[in-house]
Structures are given as C-alpha cells and as structure tokens.
C-alpha cells in the first residue's frame, strides 16, 4: 500500500479520498457545483493536490501510473426525487461523468476501481454491460444501507461497484467481499451532542430567509421564513416529522423533514429544507456529523458571502458518499 497512486474521478470534494490523502495524486471533477474561483474548499483539505475539470488539465500536473480510481459519478438522474421532478429517469450510460470514469479506467488500467452510486444505476446500466465494456475486470457489487458501513443514516442506500483486474482476483476478491462497520451508528440525539465537539461554527441560513415551503391550511400558500417554519414544527405540526401538504397528489412534501431525537437521522441532501428535532434548519456542523466526517475534515466559509458558501459546503458534504465508505476502502486496502 505504501506506493499506491490513487486518482479521484468525479469524486466531488473527496469523501472517499480524504482517508487516503497521502496516496492521492489528483481528482478530475468536471461538475461545476464542486468548484469555486480559487478552489478554497478543496485546498483546505488537500492542499496543492490537483483538482481539475478535465483529463487534459490533469496531465499537466501528473504523468505516471494509477493503481486505484475512486469515483462518485452522477447518480441523481436515477434517484426517486429526480423522477418525481422530471417524471423520467436519466440515462447514466450517456452521462458525462460515467463516460469520463470509463475512459479513465480504459486509459490507466488501474488494478482496482470503486464507484459509489445509487442502487438504481445497475437497473439502467446493467452489470453485464460493465463486464462487456471492461472485459479485463471482475466485479463485486454491494447494495446496502450506509449503516452497514457504520454511518447513522439507515434510510440512505448506496451501490458500491468494485472492479479489479481478473489476474489479481485472489488479491482483491476476498478483501472486498465483506461489508463491516467502521463506526457505530448513533441516534440523532447523540450525533447532535457529538457535533458540539467540532470546531467549525454551525453556520446556517438566517431566520428571515424564505424557502419553498408553505402552510397548506392557508388560502394564500406563500413561501415561509425559517422562523415561521420552526414555530410550526414546534406547535401546530409538532407531531409531524415530514412536512404536511395534504393535497390530492401527496400528503407530505418530498425530501422535507425534521429528524427525531431518538431515531436515526434521515437521509441528508443538498437542499436547504432539512431540520433538526427542535425545528431549526440544519447547519453545516449537523451535515458534517451526520455524513460521518471527522473534525479534521475542514470546511471553508467566507462570512462576507455566507449564503454562497453555505450552499457550496452543503453540496460538498452531501452530494456523494458518506465518510465511512472511504474508511472501509482504506481498511481493505491496508490488508493487501
């Protein structure tokens, strides 16, 4: 493991890469949502390790072999929430991030690659097609709640597609076949207590910010402020943990919830409509601890442009894998 060269391909802000940082030679990430003008969020954790938008940029920084590719290419096109918005499922085979991943595997021929995605991916891009496109690789598929890795989000289900060179099957197959917990899952109450030990301030949107949520009982269903929403959560809607809309099409607003103190937290998403048990909007520190990130994983915030950086940070923390999957990969690689 001492000489491993690891490349991120569409690995966002590096949840899979951070536990293996000393082996990482770069991250090719074409998606603009992960980039900022000076790449402040990336640099605060990875320093000068290349964080680029294309292969052409990457080869200006690094020329050499790649042993392992880690990826969390686009999965939103195959999600339930995406389907509810667009009424159609995406075509991951045509997605630029999946295409880039396959191109980099064919180019570098790594010993191992790991793709984190949504379970639906293999319905749209079957394993038989992966085997046909990458005939030199043998595959292992894991499809589990991330709680199986030790994260607390029981409802967050993820696909882990592992490919390794057939000639190295004896080395990788036994190691990556088993799932185990690298942390102990916790209820929301304990997670919130843990989050207070983090050094980052729990930045969140101002109480007077309006978000696309409404009180279904009102004739004029205008957007509510976070202050109004908190009051409703703790009074009229105190028995609800999903936001009621009570319409003919749906009873609750998709993806909008507040966590229960004595249950596991629900799935965090890049949206700003997820709430703590007391009805307050979730802050950056809450996202960190629920996604499993340690205190040493730093967050860049510029208080002079707080709204922008809260949004960027929420995407960095939630659009991609939980931290425990990266720890699981590291523990497995250490056995080889």
Set out the residue ranges of the language-model regions.
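Core alpha/beta nucleotide-donor-binding catalytic domains of modification enzymes
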Residues: 2-109, 119-123
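Extracellular structured ligand-interaction cores
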Residues: 3, 156-158, 263-265
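Short loop/turn segments at secondary-structure transitions that flank enzyme active sites
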Residues: 15, 72-75, 165-169, 274, ...
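Residues at alpha-helix caps and immediate loop-helix transition turns in enzyme cores, especially N-
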Residues: 38, 125-127, 321
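Class I S-adenosyl-L-methionine
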Residues: 60-66, 75-260
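C-terminal target-recognition/interaction regions appended to catalytic cores
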Residues: 215-336
């Amino acid at each position: 493991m001492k000489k491993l060269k690891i490349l991120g391909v569409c690995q966002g802000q590096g949840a899979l890469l951070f536990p293996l940082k000393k082996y990482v030679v770069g991250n090719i990430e074409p998606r603009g949502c992960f980039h900022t003008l000076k790449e402040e969020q990336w640099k605060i954790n990875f320093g000068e390790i290349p964080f680029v938008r294309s292969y052409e940029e990457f080869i200006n920084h690094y020329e050499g072999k790649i042993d392992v590719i880690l990826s969390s290419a686009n999965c939103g096109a195959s999600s339930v929430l995406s389907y509810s918005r667009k009424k159609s499922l995406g075509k991951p085979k045509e997605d630029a991030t999946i295409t880039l991943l396959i191109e980099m595997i064919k180019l570098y021929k790594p010993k191992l690659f790991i793709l984190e995605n949504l379970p639906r991916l293999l319905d749209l891009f079957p394993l038989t097609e992966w085997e046909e496109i990458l005939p030199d690789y043998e595959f292992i598929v894991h499809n589990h709640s991330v709680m199986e890795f030790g994260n607390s989000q029981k409802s967050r289900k993820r696909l882990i597609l592992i490919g390794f060179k057939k000639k190295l099957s004896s080395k990788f197959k036994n190691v990556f076949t088993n799932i185990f917990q690298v942390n102990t899952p916790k209820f929301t109450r304990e997670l919130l207590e843990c989050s207070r030990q983090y050094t980052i301030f729990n930045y969140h949107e101002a109480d007077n910010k309006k978000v696309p949520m409404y009180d279904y009982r009102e004739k004029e269903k205008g957007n509510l402020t976070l202050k109004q929403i908190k009051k409703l959560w703790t009074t009229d809607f105190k028995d609800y943990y999903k936001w009621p809309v009570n319409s003919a099409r749906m009873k609750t607003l998709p993806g909008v919830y507040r966590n229960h103190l004595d249950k596991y937290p629900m799935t965090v998403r890049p949206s700003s409509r997820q709430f703590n048990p007391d009805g307050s909007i979730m802050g950056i520190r809450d996202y960190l601890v629920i996604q499993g990130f340690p205190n040493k994983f730093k967050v860049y915030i510029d208080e002079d442009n707080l709204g922008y950086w809260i949004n960027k940070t929420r995407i960095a923390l939630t659009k991609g894998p939980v931290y425990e999957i990266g720890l699981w990969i590291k523990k497995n690689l250490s056995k080889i």
